[in-house]
Curated annotation (Swiss-Prot):
FAD binds at Y46, G47, L48, T49, C50, S51, A52, R72, V73. Its EC number is 1.5.1.36. NAD(+) binds at S55, H144, Y166, W167, R168, R169. This is Flavin reductase (NADH). Belongs to the non-flavoprotein flavin reductase family. Catalyzes the reduction of flavin by NADH. Subsequently, the reduced flavins is transferred to the tetracycline 7-halogenase CtcP. InterPro entries: Flavin_Rdtase-like_dom, NADH-dep_flavin_reductase, Split_barrel_FMN-bd. The lineage of its organism: Bacteria, Bacillati, Actinomycetota, Actinomycetes, Kitasatosporales. The keyword Oxidoreductase applies. It catalyses: a reduced flavin + NAD(+) = an oxidized flavin + NADH + 2 H(+).
Length: 191
């Protein structure tokens, strides 16, 4: 059974910036865009777009995602104790928008397969990498829960050139420079 979320016992409210100012500050930080997925008790897939994801530790391999405490996906994820983080590729804006919108069936027309470690949904398209995780810890922080996942499976997809980014409330693509070794091979082949 996954751990119950702990809560930060601090009263931080006095003297803080307002929410809009905070979002403007954080919007200046470019982030990757992920879709966090899990399965509900009935085996139904759940997922949401998440830009608050990052690595925590190499040994053991841990990552974290931050999810709104009112989210149905968070509830399913904590009950299941397993989830996947699907890192979207440049051009994956429509997938990000689908999983960010309040629609009934976010997985309609989305290609995915059961992950190798726990069967949670791993997206088959629009991703540069994925990580399958077991919930290691959860901490309520304000209106979100920080979920720490122990990475049990996953990997990059080297054939996909660049990730999707989010900056100042807009999508962007990471600029990809051509690998000089590949460029030399291409020039040699073209001769």
């Amino acid at each position: 059974m996954p751990p119950e979320p702990l809560s930060l016992p601090l009263d931080l409210a006095p003297g803080l910036v307002d929410g809009d100012t905070f979002l403007s500050i954080m919007g200046a930080l470019p982030t990757g865009v992920t879709v966090v997925t899990t399965l509900g008790p009935d085996g139904e897939p759940y997922g949401l777009t998440c830009s608050a994801a990052c690595s925590v530790s190499k040994a053991p391999p841990l990552l974290l995602v931050c999810i709104n405490r009112d989210s149905r996906v968070l509830k399913a994820l904590l009950e299941r104790g397993e989830f996947a983080v699907n890192v979207l590729r440049g051009g994956g804006e429509s997938t990000s928008a689908r999983f960010a919108a309040p629609v009934d069936d976010r997985f309609r027309d989305v290609r995915w397969e059961p992950g190798s470690a726990g069967g949670v949904p791993v997206m088959s398209a629009d991703v540069v990498a994925h990580a399958e995780c077991r919930v290691a810890a959860a901490l309520d922080a304000g209106d979100h829960t920080i979920v720490i996942g122990a990475v049990v499976a996953g990997g990059p997809r080297p054939e996909v050139p660049s990730p999707l980014m989010y900056w100042r409330r807009s999508y962007a693509r990471w600029p990809v420079e051509e690998d000089p070794r590949t460029a030399a091979l291409t020039l040699a082949a073209e001769g």
